[in-house]
A protein has these predicted regions:
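Non-catalytic terminal segments and appended small domains
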Residues: 1-133, 139-167
Length: 167
């Protein structure tokens, strides 16, 4: 299955093949977690989109777009915004992705990389016809809990799927 990413002019994006390694798996006794083949396969399935700058975000519990406080590292611009309100943190992905006819793009949080205080939302992008870019969204799971995203940390995991095959 073919996947093409067209970068929107004036933007940068850092995409890499998803690696097998996970910090929490490395920390298990004798790296025991790597003995689970389904975890290893899932970890490395697809590509990851990485943060281009470190930042701290916190949801105050309100429903407005002003209820998320975002603090980028000095001299940088945070790659996420409060766009929808209701505790949803939004990353704009500056690419137009294209897949072959009948293939869509599964978009979700990084596989087997839990993050305290926030959860990734998932979606299917109809990249075989849609002429639009998309956003990756996370929802805070509790208010007043600072969440940090580091430069180079994955915030989105993508892989092509054939949804028609499920019917």
């Amino acid at each position: 299955m073919k996947l093409i990413a067209y970068l929107i002019d004036g933007h940068q994006v850092d995409i890499r093949p998803a690696p097998v390694e996970r910090d929490w798996m490395e920390a298990t006794s004798q790296r025991f977690a790597y003995r689970c083949l389904p975890l290893n396969i899932a970890n490395a399935y697809g590509w990851e989109v990485l943060c281009n700058a470190s930042f701290l975000a916190m949801w105050t519990g309100g429903s407005g777009i002003d209820a998320i406080l975002i603090e980028p590292e000095p001299g940088t611009i945070a790659p996420a915004v409060s766009h929808f309100g209701h505790g949803i943190l939004t990353f704009h992905i500056p690419c137009l992705f294209r897949t072959e006819p009948g293939a869509e793009l599964m978009v979700q949080g990084p596989i087997n990389r839990p993050k305290d205080g926030i959860a990734a939302l998932s979606g299917i992008i109809e990249t075989d016809w849609s002429p639009y870019s998309f956003t990756m969204n996370w929802t805070f799971t509790r208010p007043d809990t600072p969440v940090r995203f580091e430069k180079g940390e994955p915030y989105c995991h993508i892989f092509p799927v054939s949804c028609g095959a499920l019917e």
